[in-house]
């Protein structure tokens, strides 16, 4: 098995050369990159040529972000059950959705992965290789194809426990460990398989997670469901790496997180600490600075994965574009945003998809505030906690009561796009905002509209970005809203 030192050495040997090379231009002739995230099921249900016709005619799309490795419904499959079906595609939910690798799996590229790579082949569409189906037809139209992969797994894959995290109490959890060599070897194998086997233009990978601190505090939308005792990772690989680096003592880390767990559980139950929530949190953090160090340790591991995947792809095909999907939590959590420093990240990024989902952003921010006012910010009423975050994050949107129904404005997209452009200034990295089109929200909450979509796309380009990615997936989008994006591109003469 490849150890961490060899893993980093392999990545570093090609990363330097790759970093010096200029990323390929977004499109010929200086036109903007107009991307669309789309899964295999859409081409199967509607026909490849028909889907490409719709994307080009309605959305002015010139780049496909083809979902090829995921076990999640966020980027693959039809509309999620419980949400209304769009006005195209089969009018039935795919309740038998499975997920996996929608291309051909070539085992020779996967070494020491802990699982059989063949077991990751998606069974949803039989023997169909969606990459071979779509890629030549896209190329014939002058469309680029970037393969879209994410850190979402099934838990019934034989041997998957070898890749999983271990929590505070020694239990296996469903997250994959960022420092696990089996996991890392699988990801670099996936990159090699895709880059050697197909004439692709790029690869994007996303991991919508944070480390133990953010998880324990529930510092994300939907965070009330987080279990502060199941944080990680404390597997043999993480502990060995930490001891080799010598920056923290593992037992001190565990003791600190157990104290944090007590605080979170008491806070969630409504028991106010004598000195309040935030003072108590800082007291724990001061007594156990290892808590913060372990959060950094996790993010360092994630960055090492980025660097290795980037280096592997560029060693095979120097002109391929490699980049990352940056989680929507970047718009909500100051803790998470602090880890998204674009200058060092640019060293292993040809592009960054910065999620700026305006329509669902209001609902998600309200959910985030609901979670963190049950832990760290419990001293504040929800509206005051929201205003505090608005000030910290330079966000100016509506009230806590309003935002689930109004969503965020196009101004949010423009401000975030400008901030990202400034953050990446002087680097080779292109900023491509992720634009929300019909991402599911709760009943009666804000829904996408053609005008709202048009405004968001225009706002992104007014900020000076070189491209946008229409998200999350074509199979949940209403055609009129997709046309709103295309109208913006054509009106601004960017197509």
Predicted regions and their residues:
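Hydrophobic faces of well-ordered beta-strands that scaffold small-molecule active sites
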Residues: 34-36, 64-66, 145-147, 203-205, ...
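C-terminal segment of N-terminal export signals and the immediately downstream linker at the start
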Residues: 21-35
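Substrate-binding cleft of secreted/luminal carbohydrate-active enzymes
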Residues: 349-363, 406-419, 423-487
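Aromatic-lined carbohydrate-binding/catalytic grooves of carbohydrate-active enzymes
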Residues: 63-123
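Polysaccharide-binding and catalytic clefts of secreted carbohydrate-active enzymes
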Residues: 54, 115-124, 128, 151-152, ...
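Catalytic domains of carbohydrate-active enzymes, especially glycoside hydrolases
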Residues: 50-72, 197-200, 463-467
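Aromatic- and glycine-enriched glycan-recognition loops and surfaces
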Residues: 42-58, 96-136, 186, 301-307, ...
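N-terminal secretory signal peptides and thylakoid transit peptides that target proteins
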Residues: 1-15
